[in-house]
């Protein structure tokens, strides 16, 4: 089999299994069903992945890489608070659109069911959020008393909770929930006149892209004189 065909087959296996994991979870997926769905033999499946856990590790690794890319602090450092808000929306958008990310998020929560040792993909995300919060504090966009580690923990826990709850709700509501979260969180995070002469407010902008609706919270600055 040519290398390109082998790559395509491997990707088909990953994508089909990710869709199944995202819908039914680790315990609810039988690889025999995936093999049948794809029209492959068991031998073909195990040529690429020796076990179910190998597939899990592949999916979680891809999800972790996606989280790191979407929330990478250096790329967002020009305006760290805005970058933090926009990157959280990007994570939610990716979760809604990308079956591998949806499966990765679910499997991260079910790691205790997996015999292989799998790192928590949310840890890199958490570190990136902390870095953006530190940068926002240096830029006096948030209060000097903010504990970056605790706020990063809170943000990640809230977003992960939204992802888990989405299994019982329509996915479109996740963006609305995220906007509500930031509306409440920024009240406690942002600097007040006593901290800096600049007042900052946040507004939500809504843009449409085809049939999908993308919401991004954009930080705007108003300078009081």
Locate each region found by the language model.
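Key DNA-contact positions within bacterial/archaeal DNA-binding proteins
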Residues: 43
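Basic, helix-initiating cap at the start of DNA-binding domains
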Residues: 1-24, 28-40, 53-57
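Short, charged helix-capping/linker segments at alpha-helix termini
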Residues: 27-28, 142-146
């Amino acid at each position: 089999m040519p290398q390109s065909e082998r790559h395509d087959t491997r990707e088909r296996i990953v994508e089909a299994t990710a869709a199944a994991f995202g819908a039914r979870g680790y315990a609810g997926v039988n690889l025999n069903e995936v093999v049948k769905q794809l029209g492959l033999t068991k031998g073909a499946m195990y040529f690429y992945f020796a076990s179910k856990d190998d597939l899990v590790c592949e999916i979680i690794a891809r999800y972790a890489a996606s989280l790191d890319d979407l929330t990478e602090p250096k790329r967002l450092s020009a305006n760290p608070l805005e970058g933090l808000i926009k990157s959280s929306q990007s994570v939610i958008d990716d979760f809604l659109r990308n079956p591998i990310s949806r499966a990765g998020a679910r499997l991260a929560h079910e790691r205790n069911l997996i015999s292989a040792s799998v790192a928590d993909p949310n840890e890199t995300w958490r570190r990136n959020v902390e870095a953006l919060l530190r940068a926002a504090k240096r830029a006096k966009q948030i209060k000097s008393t903010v504990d970056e580690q605790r706020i990063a923990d809170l943000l990640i826990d809230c977003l992960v909770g939204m992802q888990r709850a989405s299994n019982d709700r329509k996915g479109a509501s996740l963006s609305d929930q995220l906007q509500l979260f930031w509306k409440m969180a920024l009240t406690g995070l942002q600097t007040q006149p006593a901290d800096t002469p600049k007042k900052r407010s946040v507004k939500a902008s809504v843009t449409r892209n085809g049939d999908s609706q993308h919401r991004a919270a954009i930080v705007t600055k108003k300078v009081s004189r």
